[in-house]
C-alpha cells in the first residue's frame, strides 16, 4: 500500500515537514480555497504540486473535488457545474494525478455530534450520539416529520437530553453538525440549513440514484479518456439522516454503482470507518467482491455502543473493524494486480486519529491531529509489514 496523509493546505496545523517525518510519501489534498463548482486551473494544481515537491512529497490522491448541490438535486445550473467538473478532471489528469476521491452525500459531508469525546485514557475521539442527533432534529432544527425516524424510546431520551442542555450546549451541538467539519466545503446557519433541506423535498433514494447516475454517465467517460480513477467515498454515517436519502452505504449500493456505469474508472474509496459503522457490512467481502474497483483506502475503526446507531472512533487496531483481515484482503488485491502488470500500490491513508499527548494542548482539525494519525499509520504499517513477510513475500516491500 502507498502510505499517504491528508493535508488541508497551507492553513493546516499539521505541516508538510510533519507529514514527511511521519513516513508518508504521498499527500492527499485538494484546492480548498476554490469554491464548489468552479474549475480548478492547471496553474493552481501545479502550484500545489510544487509546494509538495519542495518537501519531497507527491500529490497522490485528490480528496475531494466537491460536487455542487445543484448536481445532486439535478436542478438549477447542474449542467454547467457538470461541465466544470469535467474540465477540472481533465486539468487534474494533465498534471499527472490519477486518482480522485469524491462523495455524493446530500448537503452534509461526514457528521458527528461530539468532537471531543473523552476516552478512558484521556485522549479524545469523535463520536456520533444517536440521542444527541435526535435532540438536534426534534428540538433544535425542528424538522417536520423527524419523529418518524426515531423510536418512541429514542424520542423520550432525546427530549430529556434536550431539556438538560444549556444555551452553550445547544450552540455547540448545532455547530458540530451543520457548521462544516474538515473536508466539508460548506457550513450553514439553521435557517440556511432548513432552506437547503427544502431543496430535497420530493427527492427519495430512487431519485437521488438517478441524479447520481446522470452525473456518472457524464464524468466517467472523461475519466476514461484521461486515465483518472474515480473513487466514491461512502456515506458517513452509512444510513439516511435528516430525512435525506443516502445511496453509498452498503454492498448493494456498491453493486448498483458498478452496474450503473460499468467501467474500471468508476470505483470506490474503501473507508472502513464509514462502512464499518454498520454491523451488516462485511468489509472483507466488499474488498473481495469489488477489489478491482477499489482505488483508494481510508483505514480506521469505530466502536458501536449500546444504541447500535451510536458510535465513537476507536484506535486503528481496536473497535469493530478487523484491521488484520482488511489489510490482508487489500494486499491480496495488490498481489492480483501486480501479477497482471499493474505495479501501482493502492493508496492508503490512516483516517482520523485520537487527539492525544501534546496535541491535546494545540488547535487541531477534528479527527486530523498529527499524533493520533501518526500512531494509526505506524500500527497499520506494522500490520502490513508482518502480513507481507508472512504471506506476500513477492510484493514490493
From Swiss-Prot:
This is Mannonate dehydratase. Its cofactor is Fe(2+); Mn(2+). Its EC number is 4.2.1.8. It comes from Yersinia pestis. It catalyses: D-mannonate = 2-dehydro-3-deoxy-D-gluconate + H2O. It is an enzyme of class 4 (lyase). GO terms for biological process: D-glucuronate catabolic process. InterPro entries: Man_deHydtase (IPR004628), Xyl_isomerase-like_sf (IPR036237). GO terms for molecular function: ferrous iron binding; manganese ion binding; mannonate dehydratase activity. Catalyzes the dehydration of D-mannonate. Pathway: Carbohydrate metabolism; pentose and glucuronate interconversion. Keywords: Iron, Lyase, Manganese. Gene3D superfamilies: Divalent-metal-dependent TIM barrel enzymes. Belongs to the mannonate dehydratase family. PANTHER family: MANNONATE DEHYDRATASE.
Amino acid at each position: 500500500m502507498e502510505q499517504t496523509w491528508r493535508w488541508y493546505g497551507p492553513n493546516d496545523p499539521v505541516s508538510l515537514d510533519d507529514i514527511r517525518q511521519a513516513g508518508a510519501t504521498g499527500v492527499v489534498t485538494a484546492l480548498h480555497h476554490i469554491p464548489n463548482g468552479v474549475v480548478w486551473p492547471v496553474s493552481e494544481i501545479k502550484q500545489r504540486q510544487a509546494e509538495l515537491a519542495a518537501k519531497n512529497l507527491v500529490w497522490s490522491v485528490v480528496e475531494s473535488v466537491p460536487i455542487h448541490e445543484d448536481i445532486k438535486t439535478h436542478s438549477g445550473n447542474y449542467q454547467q457545474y457538470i461541465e466544470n467538473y469535467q474540465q477540472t478532471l481533465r486539468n487534474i489528469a494533465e498534471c499527472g494525478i490519477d486518482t480522485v476521491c469524491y462523495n455524493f452525500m446530500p448537503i452534509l459531508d461526514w457528521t458527528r455530534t461530539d468532537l471531543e469525546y473523552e476516552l478512558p485514557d484521556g485522549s479524545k475521539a469523535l463520536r456520533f450520539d444517536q440521542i444527541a442527533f435526535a435532540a438536534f432534529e426534534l428540538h433544535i432544527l425542528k424538522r417536520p416529520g423527524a419523529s418518524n425516524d426515531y423510536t418512541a424510546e429514542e424520542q423520550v431520551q432525546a427530549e430529556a437530553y434536550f431539556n438538560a442542555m444549556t444555551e452553550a450546549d445547544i450552540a455547540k451541538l448545532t455547530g458540530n453538525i451543520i457548521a462544516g467539519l474538515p473536508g466539508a466545503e460548506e457550513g450553514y446557519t439553521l435557517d440556511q440549513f432548513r432552506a437547503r433541506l427544502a431543496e430535497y423535498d420530493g427527492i427519495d433514494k430512487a431519485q437521488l440514484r438517478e441524479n447520481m447516475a446522470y452525473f456518472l454517465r457524464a464524468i466517467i467517460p472523461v475519466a476514461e479518456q484521461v486515465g483518472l480513477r474515480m473513487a466514491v467515498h461512502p456515506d458517513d454515517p452509512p444510513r439516511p439522516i435528516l430525512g435525506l436519502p443516502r445511496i453509498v452505504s452498503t454492498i448493494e449500493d456498491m453493486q448498483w454503482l458498478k452496474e450503473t456505469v460499468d467501467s474500471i474508472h468508476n470505483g470506490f474509496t474503501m473507508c472502513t470507518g464509514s462502512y464499518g459503522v454498520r454491523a451488516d457490512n462485511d468489509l472483507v467481502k466488499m474488498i473481495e467482491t469489488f477489489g478491482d474497483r477499489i482505488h483508494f483506502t481510508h483505514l480506521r475503526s469505530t466502536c458501536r455502543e449500546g444504541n447500535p446507531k451510536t458510535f465513537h472512533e476507536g484506535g486503528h487496531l481496536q473497535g469493530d473493524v478487523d484491521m488484520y483481515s482488511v489489510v490482508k484482503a487489500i494486499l491480496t488485491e495488490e498481489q492480483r494486480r501486480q501479477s497482471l502488470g499493474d505495479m501501482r500500490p493502492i493508496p492508503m491513508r490512516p483516517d482520523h486519529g485520537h487527539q492525544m499527548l501534546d496535541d491535546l494542548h494545540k488547535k487541531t482539525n477534528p479527527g486530523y491531529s498529527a499524533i493520533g494519525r501518526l500512531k494509526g499509520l505506524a500500527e497499520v504499517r506494522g500490520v502490513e509489514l508482518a502480513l507481507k513477510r508472512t504471506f506476500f513475500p513477492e510484493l514490493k516491500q
